[in-house]
Curated annotation (Swiss-Prot):
Its main location: nucleus. There is a cross-link at residue 93 (Glycyl lysine isopeptide (Gly-Lys) (interchain with K-? in acceptor proteins)). Interacts with SAE2, SCE1, SIZ1 and MMS21. Covalently attached to a number of proteins. Interacts with NPR1; this interaction promotes NPR1 phosphorylation and triggers its sumoylation and subsequent degradation. It is found in: Nucleus; Cytoplasm. It comes from the Eukaryota. Stress conditions rapidly and substantially elevates the amount of SUMO1 and SUMO2 conjugates with a concomitant reduction in the amount of free SUMO proteins. The SUMO conjugation system plays an important function in stress protection and/or repair. This is Small ubiquitin-related modifier 3. Residues 16-93 form the Ubiquitin-like domain. It comes from Arabidopsis thaliana (Mouse-ear cress). Keywords: Cytoplasm, Isopeptide bond, Nucleus, Ubl conjugation pathway. GO terms for molecular function: protein tag activity. One of its GO terms (biological process) is protein sumoylation.
Length: 111
């Protein structure tokens, strides 16, 4: 017969971790087991290392907000099976209200 005390540490260990899925734009999915109290920065570094890219090459998005890396799964209310989207980071561009000035100041047809 099993002792109820033997089951308790296993449950506490399972509750201390969360299994997260990182999904790329091309559909690749990688599962990570992360402590609920540990910052997500390590998960982000490992994901980028496996892809052979630097951390700043990706933007990690959860529930529509970018993850900076210092947040923990507890702070973001993450549960088992939650998905973090890994999007290739883009730089540059203009806000919509700046585009009109760009066309007024520069001759884009002469390029």
């Amino acid at each position: 017969m099993s002792n109820p005390q033997d089951d308790k540490p296993i449950d506490q260990e399972q509750e201390a971790h969360v299994i997260l899925k990182v999904k790329s734009q091309d559909g690749d999915e990688v599962l990570f087991k992360n402590k609920k109290s540990a910052p997500l920065k390590k998960l982000m570094y490992v994901y980028c290392d496996r892809r052979g890219l630097k951390l700043d090459a990706f933007a990690f998005i959860f529930n529509g907000a970018r993850i900076g890396g210092l947040e923990t799964p507890d702070e973001l209310d993450m549960e088992d099976g939650d998905v973090i989207d890994a999007c290739r980071a883009m730089s540059g561009g203009l806000r919509a209200n700046q585009r009109q000035w760009s066309y007024m100041l520069f001759d884009h047809n002469g390029l």
